[in-house]
Swiss-Prot record:
Keywords: Glycosyltransferase, Magnesium, Pyrimidine biosynthesis, Transferase. Orotate binds at residues 133, 161. It comes from Sorangium cellulosum (strain So ce56). Its EC number is 2.4.2.10. The gene is pyrE. The keyword Magnesium applies. This is Orotate phosphoribosyltransferase. It catalyses: orotidine 5'-phosphate + diphosphate = orotate + 5-phospho-alpha-D-ribose 1-diphosphate. The keyword Glycosyltransferase applies. 5-phospho-alpha-D-ribose 1-diphosphate binds at residues 101-102, 105, 107, 129-137.
Length: 192
């Protein structure tokens, strides 16, 4: 990571600590209990947060096989995909954004993948996630993208909770890059 990237990461971690992180007992989407909650949207949806995640995640794409689009997993991954897509355009390597829905709506386009009109069969796509816990929602998004014709090349997470999710995704054959981990918020405190 470049010096500029390191300072961007430090600022993003500070923003996440300030706006998104709460140390309290919660039940997560996975059904697991946790001693902390991180609502990344509270940081990502600020102008600065949007710029920081766009830059850092675009840079992190360099650790994955080359992609031609980025896909955000509903809901937290959607602003990430938009931020990276905008950054990619500004840096001269435009990548369209896709949004992967959790389920088809019963009205409108009834699509599982929004933005799919530009999706060519076999197109390499990187998935962007806000938080990885078990990896379950990410792996479901992988299947939805594959059904839509994409070739998923890897996953970039804003936060890896270090609870086995990244390992589950890697076990499915996909590389995972995390911008931050639980250690950025709770140093030397293993999950559980």
């Amino acid at each position: 990571m470049s010096a500029a990237g390191a300072s961007e990461r430090e600022r993003l971690v500070a923003l996440l600590r300030e706006r998104s992180f709460e140390q309290k007992r919660v039940v997560l989407a996975s059904g697991r209990e946790s001693d902390f909650f991180i609502d990344c949207k509270q940081s990502v949806l600020t102008a600065e947060g949007h710029a920081l995640v766009g830059s850092l995640m675009f840079e992190a794409l360099g650790a994955l096989p080359r992609c031609e689009a980025v896909a955000g997993v509903e809901l937290g991954g959607c602003p990430l995909a938009s931020a990276v897509s905008l950054t990619s355009f500004l840096r001269g390597r435009p990548l369209p954004a896709l949004y992967v829905r959790k389920e088809v709506k019963d009205h409108g386009s009834r699509r599982l993948v929004e933005g799919d009109r530009g999706l060519v069969p076999g197109m390499p796509v990187a998935i962007l996630e806000d938080v990885i816990t078990t990896g379950g929602s990410t792996l479901k998004a992988v299947e939805k993208l594959r059904t839509a014709g994409a070739s998923v090349v890897g996953v970039i997470a804003l936060v890896d909770r270090l609870e086995g999710g990244a390992e589950a995704i890697r076990a499915a054959g996909l590389p995972v890059v995390a911008i931050c981990t639980r250690r950025d918020f709770i140093p030397d405190n293993p999950p559980g």
